[in-house]
A protein has these predicted regions:
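Conserved glycine-rich "GG(E/T)P / GGGxP" loop and the immediately following alpha-helix
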Residues: 37-41, 142-144
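Acidic/polar N-terminal loop/beta-strand segments that form early-domain functional surfaces
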Residues: 33-38, 64-66, 90
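A glycine-rich helix N-cap at a beta->alpha junction
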Residues: 55-63
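Alpha/beta enzyme core
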Residues: 2, 6-31, 46-56, 69-166
Length: 166
């Protein structure tokens, strides 16, 4: 997650805004601004910086989301109106979580990732005017079979169709 939820004293919106503005002043061009589907404050923060035109033209915001359809849809609602955004989606891929959490094999977990990528692509028209890029993370991949970690990323790339500039 963006780490804010793990803090003993999570940042309030004003503090997050100070942090965002500081990162912009420092010259960062890609800034993760939250996990808008995980909490209303994160959603509201993303909407605030978009609606108040606080994102410089040369800065891309990034939002984090689990590979779950309802959360992906909510995330796209949050970025509507941004000039550019990176949607960073993820799902766990290690054998223990595949078995215990999802009750799925490699094919089933790959389907979660591919379905998420497909949904993301299908939602692009809902944020017309926003240049959307993607980041996919196979969460806990270091505990997964290396061949599987590579294969699931390749399956996602087949949907996302990355280019050198996107």
């Amino acid at each position: 997650r963006d780490g804010n939820q793990a803090l003993i004293d999570p940042m309030d919106p004003e503090r997050k805004l100070r942090m965002f503005k500081t990162l912009v002043r420092m010259g960062f061009k890609e800034i993760e601004v939250g996990f808008p589907s995980a909490s209303q404050p994160d959603f509201d923060f993303v909407r605030h910086i978009i609606e108040h035109d606080l994102i410089p033209d040369d800065v891309t915001i990034q939002v984090l989301v689990q590979s779950r359809p309802e959360l992906i849809r909510r995330t796209y609602e949050s970025i509507r109106g941004a000039k550019q955004a990176i949607v960073h989606f993820y799902n766990s891929v290690n054998p223990l979580q595949r078995r215990v959490v999802f009750g799925l094999d490699q094919a089933g977990v790959t389907k979660i990732a591919v379905d998420a990528a497909t949904l993301c692509r299908s939602l692009e028209p809902t944020v017309a005017g926003t240049r959307v890029r993607y980041e996919y993370s196979p969460e806990s991949f270091t505990l997964a079979e290396p061949e599987f970690a590579v294969a699931i990323c390749e399956a996602v790339m087949d949907v996302i169709e990355p280019t050198p500039t996107n």
